[in-house]
Curated annotation (Swiss-Prot):
Enzyme class, first EC level, given as a word: transferase
EC number: 2.7.7.39
Gene: tarD
Known partners and oligomeric status: Homotetramer or homodimer.
Source organism of this protein record: Staphylococcus aureus (strain NCTC 8325 / PS 47)
Protein name (database record): Glycerol-3-phosphate cytidylyltransferase
Residues binding substrate, per UniProt: K44, K77
GO biological process, one term: teichoic acid biosynthetic process
NCBIfam families: cyt_tran_rel (TIGR00125), g3p_cytidyltrns (TIGR01518)
Length: 132
């Protein structure tokens, strides 16, 4: 079985998220999504509209996702690749090069994001330009 993993906050779930998950799942047989915990979001200075359990429930309801695990810190990725016997590590292209250190353990792919949509864009359109 070919295992794929990706990471994210997945707040204000939108079609760009779904498209990324669909494309990631097409790269293997089993998709693991490491979802940022509320505590990790605080460390990253991010505020989510939905809490971890709500975001997890939404991700688990998506047919492309096989397993949702908590992402608790920056250094977790290498451990996850080994623990879950990951074949393909997928991130959005805005992270290009950041995870190349994993290439000796698995294939690393940076996917182009869906144009015209992002959580930040949604928040800014709803709440004004200062929203993040």
């Amino acid at each position: 079985m070919k295992r794929v993993i990706t990471y994210g906050t997945y707040d204000l779930l939108h079609y760009g998220h779904i498209e990324l998950l669909r494309r990631a799942r097409e790269m293997g047989d089993y998709l693991i999504v490491a979802l940022s915990t509320d505590e990790f979001n605080q460390i990253k200075h991010k505020k989510s509209y939905y809490d971890y359990e709500q975001r997890k429930m939404m991700l688990e309801s998506i047919r492309y996702v096989d397993l949702v695990i908590p992402e608790k810190g920056w250094g977790q990725k290498e451990d996850d690749v080994e623990k879950f016997d990951v074949d393909v590590f997928v991130m959005g292209h805005d992270w290009e090069g950041e995870f190349d250190f994993l290439k000796d353990k698995c294939e690393v792919i940076y996917l182009k994001r869906t144009e015209g949509i992002s959580t930040t864009k949604i928040k800014q359109e709803l709440y004004g330009k200062d929203a993040k």
